[in-house]
């Protein structure tokens, strides 16, 4: 079997995680935001929502540890608040909502005053309830040596030449990765959905003893979640076209800001989300925005989850470029919403069930790493989805059936933990070493 080039696993990554603050009764905290001056604990739309932002890290384990450090830092402060202890709500879905407007928008001043106007716009257009959802964003950047390594075993990569040519080639590779990630967004939602219970007070604030909604495994990624009131179509043929296809929605008044485009994947330059900067400087990284918080993990995500996302991006980066026309884009987004349903026997656009599609996708991912020289753990990737315990739907399990261990490793063989756990061959041990996994 061919030896794997370790450069195929070189990447930089970061995590962002939103969390609502609640009091000891599990109600939304109404106290002032305690971390307004902390760059690691950002302020999002609501005063009772925190956003954890890790540094850029060189491995899945490192970024997971960075998020855990921030999580524990916040928990220590919240526990000792003078107004009474507060806690981080562990779900993507909000707790009981007593009244509309329980998540007061933050007020920003000076250079950040535009944020207040923008958030008021979101409140007026979408309502405050939508802003109660929380989730996790995964950011990943591949260096030049990765693209060179992936081109040797896959169907994509970057060419050689001057710096300008390499940048254009890298931008094209990221555009291809974004297109393929959008095509596979349904798989990410399916494997990471962890929010099957949504109290009816979300729809009718103040209603008590309402029957929880059980239709969705991930409401925030479903038709009732973070979506615009139109179906966006993007241009993946060039970076110029990609930027212009988003800006057209702001120029015609459909959106107030590019940030208002609720889409599962974003291409970004370094720093704040700025499309003109993206146009000038090129793509720095890709952001995946459709990950639910896993309530079985102390910080909302297991380290295996991050490893799997990394490996999935490696696999998708290897896929050959192909056109991504409007019709396919719309089907991809509809499939993603479909995968957010609790019933994974629902068929996607190709006529196969969500579960059948997932088994097939994971088999193809396994075969890719085997061709590249790395072999997957014993039992392979494909049986993962099919091996869920009787009566347990895979979207609910994720990597979390039975909970996780103190070091963040999930003890189960069910769900997304399986591709990177279990008994491993020498080649898989090599992959673990390249990922800096102890």
Each model region followed by its residue ranges:
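Loop-rich catalytic cores of soluble enzymes, especially ATP-dependent carboxylate-amine ligases
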Residues: 110-128, 132, 141-283, 298, ...
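Intrinsically disordered, low-complexity tandem-repeat regions
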Residues: 378-381, 385, 390-403, 408-409, ...
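Flexible helix-coil linker/hinge segments at domain or subdomain boundaries
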Residues: 81-83, 182-197, 313-342
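Terminal catalytic/cofactor-binding subdomain
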Residues: 1-123, 130-132
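Sequence termini and other peripheral, non-core segments
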Residues: 1-44, 327, 331-381, 386, ...
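C-terminal catalytic subdomain
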Residues: 299-321
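Extracellular structured ligand-interaction cores
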Residues: 14-16, 47-49, 133-137, 176-178, ...
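Histidine-centered divalent-metal-coordination microenvironment in nucleic-acid enzymes
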Residues: 18, 130-143, 285-293
